[in-house]
């Protein structure tokens, strides 16, 4: 990817990177392990972003 990115694209990529985290441990504890996975989790090779 180019080093000189437009700021809007850089912000979108940063937002996607922040969203791409696992769910917190306290959520697992609070829900008695009913919620374990994050349905919108994205793996960089499988699912690409719209840029």
Swiss-Prot record:
GO terms for cellular component: cytosolic large ribosomal subunit. It comes from the Archaea. Keywords: Ribonucleoprotein, Ribosomal protein. The keyword Zinc-finger does not apply. GO terms for biological process: translation. Gene3D superfamilies: Ribosomal protein L39e. It holds the Pfam family Ribosomal_L39. GO terms for molecular function: structural constituent of ribosome. SUPFAM superfamilies: Ribosomal protein L39e. The keyword rRNA processing does not apply. PANTHER family: LARGE RIBOSOMAL SUBUNIT PROTEIN EL39, RIBOSOMAL PROTEIN L39E. Belongs to the eukaryotic ribosomal protein eL39 family. NCBIfam families: PRK01242.1. This is Large ribosomal subunit protein eL39. The lineage of its organism: Archaea, Methanobacteriati, Methanobacteriota, Thermococci, Thermococcales.
